[in-house]
């Protein structure tokens, strides 16, 4: 017997039986579905924490605001500055390490850092860097 047209055509807005529905029904198996034979317990989902990316960004921004309060910096500019600081840090640390080994010592002191800065940076820039570094170390030791 042929079926009536109302039985074969689905109602407006509802999906056909057997075809996948757009909304995931709680009865069907999915990521959050209960497993049969487990006593109705749900498995604890362990969420991975996002790894923290270390950056000098906040410090670069603070220095920028001290020097030019009305100036901003783009994320690309911040990335360049961060790379620059990491590069200089690595160079100074490497040079200070070589100086420490050359003097047969096991600890990098402020003196090695100062000498490394003098060796790496040219002329006036080295003088200003040493004076600012000395000022920062003095401020730190007096605040302790």
Curated annotation (Swiss-Prot):
Residues 1-51 are annotated as: Disordered. A motif (SPKK motif 5) lies at residues 25-28. It comes from the Eukaryota. Keywords: Chromosome, DNA-binding, Glycoprotein, Isopeptide bond, Nucleosome core, Nucleus, Phosphoprotein, Ubl conjugation. Signal peptide: none annotated. A motif (SPKK motif 4) lies at residues 19-22. A motif (SPKK motif 2) lies at residues 9-12. A motif (SPKK motif 3) lies at residues 14-17. GO terms for cellular component: nucleosome; nucleus. Glycans are attached at residue 131. There is a cross-link at residue 139 (Glycyl lysine isopeptide (Lys-Gly) (interchain with G-Cter in ubiquitin)). It is found in: Nucleus; Chromosome. InterPro entries: Histone-fold (IPR009072), Histone_H2A/H2B/H3 (IPR007125), Histone_H2B (IPR000558), HISTONE_H2B_site (IPR055333). Pfam families: Histone. A motif (SPKK motif 1) lies at residues 4-7. Belongs to the histone H2B family. Contains 5 SPKK motifs which may interact with the minor groove of A/T-rich DNA sites. Phosphorylation of this motif may regulate DNA binding. This motif is reiterated in both termini of histone H1 and in the C-terminus of plant H2A, but its presence in the N-terminus seems to be unique to sea urchin histones H2B. The nucleosome is a histone octamer containing two molecules each of H2A, H2B, H3 and H4 assembled in one H3-H4 heterotetramer and two H2A-H2B heterodimers. The octamer wraps approximately 147 bp of DNA. Core component of nucleosome. Nucleosomes wrap and compact DNA into chromatin, limiting DNA accessibility to the cellular machineries which require DNA as a template. Histones thereby play a central role in transcription regulation, DNA repair, DNA replication and chromosomal stability. DNA accessibility is regulated via a complex set of post-translational modifications of histones, also called histone code, and nucleosome remodeling. This is Histone H2B.2, sperm.
């Amino acid at each position: 017997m042929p079926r009536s047209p109302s039985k074969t055509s689905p109602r407006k807005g509802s999906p056909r039986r057997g075809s996948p529905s757009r909304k995931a029904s709680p009865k069907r198996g999915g990521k959050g579905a209960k497993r049969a034979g487990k006593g109705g317990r749900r498995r604890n989902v362990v969420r991975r924490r996002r790894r923290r990316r270390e950056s000098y960004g906040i410090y670069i921004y603070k220095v920028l605001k001290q020097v030019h309060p009305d100036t901003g910096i783009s994320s690309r500019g911040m990335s360049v500055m961060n790379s620059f600081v990491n590069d200089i840090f690595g160079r100074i640390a490497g040079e200070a390490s070589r100086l420490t080994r050359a003097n047969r010592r096991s600890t990098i002191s402020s003196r090695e850092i100062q000498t490394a800065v003098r060796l790496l940076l040219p002329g006036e820039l080295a003088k200003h860097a040493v004076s600012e570094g000395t000022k920062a170390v003095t401020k730190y030791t007096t605040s302790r």
